[in-house]
């Protein structure tokens, strides 16, 4: 709740007044929550700048892997299993598209909420637009420049890999849940 109320009247505030000209400005208090984009925007920018120094001089692609809301209950009750499977399925999908003997790379970060602060598990991945082949040579991916891999094909592979990981987990999941997951586009 504090994040929603950040820099609003709900958290109080103070009045700044200029002794010289009489200008008055109301400033509302921040929530100081480490997850708040208003309070932590400068830290986010610092993180981005630090990551930019680590980048190779190659094209990069932003790829997002999302879980359908049918899995929200499981994400709340078994987060380690659900999120481990999310990262693993994403990585296995990238590996599947770069080829068996090639080495890809990826930086990924978990977000568990959406823009409206509701539960929406997904990971943002920054993936180099290429790979190192079996001889240690860098190869650019064959892409149209807009997408690293075909989106629909990648979605289907990701869904299959994620569901396979759920099936092998120690969670008891009804078959109807798996049926529902395969009926949806991911």
Protein language model regions, located:
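Beta->alpha loop/short-helix hinge microenvironment recognizer with preference
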Residues: 1-186
């Amino acid at each position: 709740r504090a994040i929603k109320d950040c820099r609003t009247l709900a958290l109080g505030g103070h009045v700044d007044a200029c002794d010289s000209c009489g200008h008055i400005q109301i400033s509302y208090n921040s929530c100081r929550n480490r997850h708040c984009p208003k309070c932590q925007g400068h830290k986010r920018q610092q993180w981005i700048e630090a990551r930019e120094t680590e980048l190779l001089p190659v094209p990069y692609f932003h790829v997002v892997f999302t879980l359908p809301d049918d899995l929200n209950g499981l994400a709340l009750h078994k987060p380690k299993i659900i999120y481990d499977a999310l990262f693993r399925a994403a990585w296995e999908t990238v590996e599947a598209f770069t080829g068996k003997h090639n080495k890809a790379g990826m930086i990924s970060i978990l977000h568990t909420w959406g823009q409206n602060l509701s539960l929406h598990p997904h990971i943002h991945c920054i993936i180099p637009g290429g790979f190192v082949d079996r001889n240690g040579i860098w190869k650019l991916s064959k892409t149209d420049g807009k997408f690293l891999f075909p989106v629909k094909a990648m979605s289907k592979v990701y869904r299959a890999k994620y569901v396979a990981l759920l099936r092998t987990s120690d969670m008891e999941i009804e078959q109807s849940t798996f049926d529902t997951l395969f009926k949806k586009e991911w």
